[in-house]
Swiss-Prot record:
Keywords: Cell membrane, Disulfide bond, G-protein coupled receptor, Glycoprotein, Membrane, Receptor, Signal, Transducer, Transmembrane, Transmembrane helix. One of its GO terms (molecular function) is G protein-coupled peptide receptor activity. It is found in: Cell membrane. Residues 28-221, 273-279, 345-373, 449-457 are extracellular. InterPro entries: GPCR_2-like_7TM, GPCR_2_secretin-like, Methusela_ecto_dom_1, Methusela_ecto_dom_2, Methuselah_N_dom, Methuselah_N_sf, Mth_GPCR. This is G-protein coupled receptor Mth. GO terms for biological process: cell surface receptor signaling pathway; determination of adult lifespan; response to starvation. Belongs to the G-protein coupled receptor 2 family. Mth subfamily. It is a multi-pass membrane protein. Coiled coil: none annotated.
Amino acid sequence: MKLFWVKRLLRISTVVVTLLLLQRTNAAIPDCDYYDTVDISAAQKLPNGSYLFEGLLVPANLTAEYEFTILPDDSKQKVDKHIRGCVCKLKPCVRFCCPHNHIMDMNVCAGDMTEEELEVLDPFLNVTLDDGSVVRRHFKKELIVQWDLPMSCDGMFSLDNREKTDQYTLFENGSFFRHHDRVTLNKREYCLQHLTFVDGNESSIRIAPHNCLISPSRMGQTVVMITSLVCMVLTITVYLFVKKLQNLHGKCFMCYMVCLFMAYLLLLLNLWQMSQNFCITAGFLGYFFVMAAFLWLSVISLHLWNTFSGSAHNANRFLSEHRFLAYNTYAWGMAVVLTGITYLADKVVENEDWNPRMGFGGHCWICTQSWSAMLYFYGPMVFLIAFNITMFILTANRIIGVKKDIQKFAHRQERKQKLNSDKQTYTFFLRLFIIMGLTWSLEIGSYISQFNQTWSNVFLVADYLNWSQGIIIFILFVLKRSTLRLLMESIRGEGEEVNDSEEEISLENTKYDRNVL
């Protein structure tokens, strides 16, 4: 019996020891993040189990044997057994991409620095302490260099703090704050390394941060935009095919759709980096068509207001059949002027705060990370949106007033005057809201909130709404009963061309006859 219990105890002891060893190997150092550790296998081990690493005494309880590495996504990868120490609990650490004597070239570790490179190396870093003060620290003498941690990603980009958009703050605890988008990164998401900077004929080597190229999934935006482009083509085709839709308002609407199609096409090419060979040209073309689209929206807004306010005949008196030519001169001409101003500013203005910087950062568009975008792009957009909103309110107010007037007149004359139901009226307001481009006003909020991650996620809904413009317009203006009826008549050869003077709004059945009043 005693022998039985002895064997039992031995088995239990063996299991316990095995579990402890496994814990020692796999659980690693208690209360210590893997990214706060350093490989100290080559350090001197003292009799009490502690290690002497680069002049720093690492106690035994802050060391452990590892046979894995933890990747940035927190998954484990098996490696050879080695000893690691939680040295960042004892002394501030700095996360390097490569060994401390290597230099980065094209975002790749390029090997040891030469003697000449070491002579021009600036070894100091600005480190922000917990109390908010900023001190200069020698990366090797005053900090622990962590260079054996897994790289955050394959594709990285460096920051140059000479640029206002590349400012950053490195904290004593190892976290990294990127100023332009106000994002805080941990040591899994960035690393530092020596990098050559060229300024005129002189070059210098400084320690520069490298961040991952984190690109959000483009699939959702791509699917929405391609669908939107197809819907735009279908909408334009319907308006070209159906003669009754080709009145003055319909022609303006088609011009708007052409501008929108070209702007979205260039945006899609930029999204998939298919316009890099003509990036600057693509950027200015995209700017031209976006501005032209907004200008055509202002034309449509003004034309709708004239139609419903009863002042269209006054416009006819002065412009007659040349109104469409006048509209074209205004929309395309102003778009050319705005594009020309932006082009000259891009070539002449030296101050980055006033330069649109077309093509900055490989994006074939105006640099939206600075306030110059407000001057050249969002400023004109705000003005035109404000104009469209004013026209929308005046037009909606006029429609409501006309409806009430006709109802009173019909009651007085005891005539049955059936107008659209409330549902139809609300639907018309929705269509009017879309065609006047008021949904674009959300784009301003998206621009202002780009540096706030929370609000950026909120306004992502607005971005998808704008990317879906072609789909929304197709549903509201083509897939409606009156347009489908006109389309069927045209297919059967029953359609007749409508004179522009009739001022029929082809986007909606709702209208009133001024002669009734």
